[in-house]
Amino acid sequence: MTRVTIIGGGYGGITIAKALDDVAEVTLVEQKDTFVNHAAALRAAVDRQWAERIFLPYDRLLARGRVVHGTALAVRGTTVSVTGAGDIEADHLVLATGTAYPFPAKHLESSSVIAKARIERAHTNLEQAGRVLIAGAGEVGIELTGEITSAFPAMEVVLLEAGP
């Protein structure tokens, strides 16, 4: 059976892993201990119930394949070197390492425990704040403004944008 190693367990990586799970020997390499639904991360910063919902365990993702928690260090030919797992042989390699944005839009921590603590700290800070300044009126800034004003209607929110 064809061996496919996917580096990155975000939206793209898990989509490919699930699609190939029945037809290939799939290995998904991911640093984080859980899948993070980043689309809901801004809501989680203002709503404690959502903070638990954005973290989904990888253990039920694949029926046949496996998830290796580690960092891909190098690719040499058909071999992927992974921290904590050694070398993984692959016939095909998929790089699905995704993107990085600052917190609270994305959680870059490998441990969901640390990420949940950051969310809780952000929520507590928002509860105690009378006003908030959000720098950047792009998609994330506007969405975060909406989440904050919805969850904390009395909060004064200033959205700062450098461009016209």
Regions found by a protein language model. Give the residues of each.
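Short beta->alpha junction loops/turns
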Residues: 9-10, 86, 137-138
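A general structural signal for short secondary-structure boundary/capping elements
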Residues: 53, 73-75, 137-141
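Beta1-alpha1 glycine-rich phosphate/pyrophosphate-binding loop at the start
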Residues: 2-66, 143-164
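FAD-binding core/adjacent interface of flavoenzyme oxidoreductases
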Residues: 2-4, 63-135
